[in-house]
Every structure is written in C-alpha cells, then in structure tokens.
A protein has these predicted regions:
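Solvent-exposed loop/turn and edge beta-strand elements of beta-rich ligand-binding domains
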Residues: 1-424
Length: 424
C-alpha cells in the first residue's frame, strides 16, 4: 500500500571500530544501538567512542529505490540528506551488513533491503467569494493539509501571505474529524500587519494531538475583505517538520505549496452622451445585482460608502470600480445561470439637466475586458419631451392654447345668449 518516492537522497556511512566478523563486534553493535539517538546520530556514535567513515550517496529512482553495492561487512548509519518539498524524512537509522535471515536463523543475508517510510504532506486551498459583490465584502480562504505520518512531529505550521489587496479579518483552525484543539494551548494564530502574513503554528501539545490523529486533516479558514480591484492570487505554505522552517519554498526539504487560487475584482466605464453624441454631465446612477432590486431601487451596491455615482467628468465618463467579476466565482469560471454568476443593473436616478430619465435599468457585466481601460457602455439620453416644449412651459404654444380657451368660452357665452333669446 506504500507509494514509491523518487528524488530522495540517502547517505550511507560505515561506523568504524566495530568488526562484525567477531562476536564482540556484534555485541558492540548491539550496545551502540541501545544508545543511538536518531535526533543526534553523529553525536551519539562519536559519544560512544566510534567514528564515521566518509559516506556515499544515492538518489532514489522512479521506483523509489537506491541500491548501494559492494559495501564491506560492517555497521552503517543511513540518513536522508535531501528530499522533495513537503516530505518529512524518515529518521536516521543503523543497519548491519550482513543481517540474520529472519526466515532461517542459521543464515546470513548479504543483500539487505530496508524500507524507510517518508511522510508526504499534501495540501489544498480553496476560495469562497460567490456571496461577495462589492469591495468590503468578505472573501474566505480554506487551507486543508494532511498531517505528517511521523511520531513525534517536531514542527508543523501553515503560513498564508495575503495579497495587499486583502484585509485580514479572522482565522479559525480545526481538525476535519472533529478532534478538539484549542487556540493558545495547541496552536497559535499570528497576523503580521507588516507582511500581511497569517501564521498558524502548532505547539508541542498540539503536535502530539496531530501525531495521534494523523489520518485526519488540519483545516484553516481565513476570512478577509477585499480593498482594491484586481485579479488577486493567493496560495499557502505548509511546513511539515522543523527542518522545513528554514528552507525556501520550492527547495528540496522545503514546505508544501498549495495550488494558487484567485478572487477577481474590477469595474466598468460608462460614457454619458446626448442624442448627437455630445458628452453630458450631471447624471447620477445606482448599481444593483437583481432585476427586482433595480426596479424597486432597493439594496443598491455601496462602494467607498456611496450608493450613488455622479458623472462629473467633462468628457461624460464615469468609472465604477470595486465589483466582483460576473464570470468568475469561488476560484473558477462561471456562466449565466451558474451559482455565483453576477448580473449587474445600472439605474439612472437623476438625468442630466434638460434630459429625460432613462426608462429602464441597463444590464451589464464586469469582466477582465470591462476592467481594462476604455469605454464599456455608452448611455444616451434624449431631451425633455423629445425637444418639443409642452404648454405651460412658455413659448408660442402656450399663447395659442390661451387664445383657443378664450374662444371656447366666448362661443359658450354666445350659445347661451342665443338660446335664451330663442326661449324668450
């Protein structure tokens, strides 16, 4: 059930001063094994009065094998000296050449096979932003990491360096199987305001819990808010052992790097013009995320504390920034009808002076294309009443109506007079 691991470098060094061709040599080897310390292999060997010869090194192949041939009879120290990122190495160990055949105690095995087991720590990262619409809304990132199959675990931490466009809000840490862990006792959460990095590090007590529950996973949820537009990429680092803490990401023996996830934010630019194409100013717009809200003018989008956006530029342009991409949610592309897809509605709540208010909302989307420089939407207004001055607003038309009214009244009077005369 084990998976071969290529790319692991092993070094083999003979312990000098122990002669395994004699019974006393085997006794000395047994004594050394009793005091051998995997945490300090060289020190425990030299402390027992022995030395180590120059070593030879090999890297495991695609089958996870490294074969050291031609070794003389003796006791050897075997260590992993290099291994892929995200891998917790097996502890150093002593092995003798030859070994007693476990199936035939009267026989020696000179072809020795050992199977050191490495712990591979994999990790994933996801983003949840489908419910986010405008800058200031919450976007959450979830890091899920395996636990090293090692005991003891000498170090374990997760670091998420947040993009400057993200503001840290809070973080929680749990084990996927529900095993209880407590902040402060089993782990710490530190947010560095200078680097915007969030670090979750397990204490000795917490690492003991991890070692005892290494078939579950560590889950870190980080809540942020978005403060600026952009395609904001994010990934996390999982350091599976103490040695990995001092190794750069991507280097052998370094941390596991999660896949990168993104949350994408942008805007659009509107050009306000009259029927002849001349730029207009003074229009005021609101933005909504549903047709019902747009019709009722309820729940408008709020950006930088404003729910209304006025065209003040002389060229009639208005840029509305700070909206999530319509076609990208929860780290993936979405299409109309998919969960997380955003259809926006632009509603004119004040028309330019002398122009009619738009009769209906205008649908629009926010994408990488609309966020790029340039005009994305041209909105045309028509003059009041199509340019014709209605009565009571001044001009010749009013005078005509007044005269017609007088004529009607006069005609009425004549009619009455005539009628009365006829009845006289």
């Amino acid at each position: 059930g084990l998976t071969p691991l290529p790319g692991v470098e092993f070094q083999v060094r003979q312990v000098t001063g122990i002669d395994l061709s004699t019974n006393s040599g085997w006794a000395n080897a047994s004594t050394l094994s009793g005091v051998f310390d995997a945490a300090d292999p060289d020190g425990s060997i030299t402390g027992a009065g022995y030395t180590l010869a120059a070593g030879s090194s090999l890297v495991t192949d695609a089958a996870g094998q490294a074969s050291f041939t031609g070794l003389p009879i003796g006791l050897y120290l075997v260590e992993e000296t290099s291994f892929p990122a995200g891998v917790t190495p097996s502890a150093p160990f002593l092995v003798s050449v030859p070994l007693t055949d476990p199936d035939n105690r009267d026989n020696w095995l000179y072809d020795v096979h050992v199977y050191p087991k490495n712990a591979i720590t994999t990790a994933t990262k996801t983003v949840a932003d489908a419910d986010a619409v405008q800058l200031g809304d919450e976007v959450s990132f979830t890091i899920t990491s395996d636990i090293p199959n090692a005991n003891p675990i000498d170090g374990f931490k997760i670091v998420d360096a947040l993009d400057p466009k993200l503001d840290y809000v809070a973080a929680t840490v749990t084990l996927a199987d529900g095993t209880t862990i407590a902040e402060g006792t089993d782990y710490t959460i530190v947010h560095d305001a200078g680097t915007n990095a969030v670090t979750v590090e397990f204490t000795a007590a917490g690492r003991a819990i991890l070692a005892a529950n290494n078939t579950t996973q560590v889950v870190v949820d980080i809540v942020t808010t978005v403060n600026a537009v952009g395609e904001i990429a994010n990934q996390a680092l999982v350091y599976p052992n103490a040695a990995s803490f001092d190794i750069d990401p991507g280097e052998p023996g370094g941390p596991t790097t999660t896949p990168e996830v993104e949350t994408r934010w942008g805007g659009l630019t509107v050009a306000k013009v009259g029927q002849g194409g001349a730029a207009l100013t003074g229009a005021v717009f609101q933005v909504f995320t549903s047709a019902a809200d747009a019709a009722a003018q309820t729940n408008p989008v709020t950006l930088n504390g404003d729910t209304e956006f006025e065209v003040v530029n002389a060229d009639g342009t208005l840029t509305i920034e700070g909206l999530r991409y319509s076609d990208f949610a929860n780290g993936a592309t979405v299409a109309p009808g998919d969960a997380g897809y955003l259809q926006y509605y632009l509603v004119e709540v004040q028309a330019p002076s002398g122009y009619e208010l738009l009769a209906a909302p205008i649908e629009f989307t926010v994408t990488a294309a609309t966020t790029a420089a340039g005009i994305d939407l041209t909105v045309t207004n028509v003059p009041h009443n199509g340019g014709f001055q209605l009565p009571f607003t001044g001009g010749t038309g009013t005078g005509l109506l007044y005269l017609a009214g007088i004529g009607l009244i006069a005609g009425g009077v004549v009619f009455l007079v005539v009628k009365r005369r006829r009845n006289a």
